[in-house]
């Protein structure tokens, strides 16, 4: 939508979007998943995210209109992503039998779908003042004494059972 495309986003819980985009976006229409059976319009590109099964009515519209059907998978750095990105996934049964979905794997390497980012991200990064941000948001909340150098860790993961123990162990090791 940021690039000028119209987007219809079908969701089962639109409350989940409130914190991400409380004001919405003029090019994004949010629709209830439960209403998908009643739609008569389908986009030129349909993105099925994370293996969610589309209603038969929607699959039929995709096949009838000839929409590009993308099967969006999770971001991964695993080696199979390079082998699987862009492969056809033939529909074997149902309303779109014989039609192809196309695997799309976001990833970090050339040969994957890459990473989508805001159009102004590089400009914002180049003007970001890390020291000012740290002084404003991190250091006032810190209990470390001024002589110790903090250990900065970026952690991106699902929340495993051992995460709390890991964080506590890190905190006690200072």
In which residue ranges do the predicted regions lie?
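A nucleotide-sugar donor-handling region in carbohydrate enzymes
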Residues: 73-165
């Amino acid at each position: 939508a940021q690039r000028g495309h119209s987007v219809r986003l079908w969701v089962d819980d639109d409350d989940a979007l409130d914190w991400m985009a409380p004001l919405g976006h003029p090019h994004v229409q949010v629709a209830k998943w439960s209403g998908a059976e009643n739609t008569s319009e389908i986009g030129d590109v349909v993105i099925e995210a994370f293996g969610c099964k589309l209603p038969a009515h929607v699959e039929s519209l995709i096949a009838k209109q000839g929409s590009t059907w993308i099967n969006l998978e999770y971001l991964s750095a695993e080696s199979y992503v390079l082998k699987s990105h862009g492969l056809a996934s033939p529909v074997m049964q149902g309303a779109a039998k014989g039609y192809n979905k196309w695997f799309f794997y976001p990833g970090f390497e050339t040969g994957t779908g890459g990473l989508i980012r805001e159009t102004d991200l590089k400009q914002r990064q180049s003007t970001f003042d890390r020291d000012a941000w740290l002084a404003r948001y991190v250091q006032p909340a810190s209990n470390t004494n001024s002589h110790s150098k903090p250990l900065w860790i970026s952690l991106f993961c699902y929340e495993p059972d051992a995460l709390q123990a890991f964080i506590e162990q890190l905190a006690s090791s200072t």
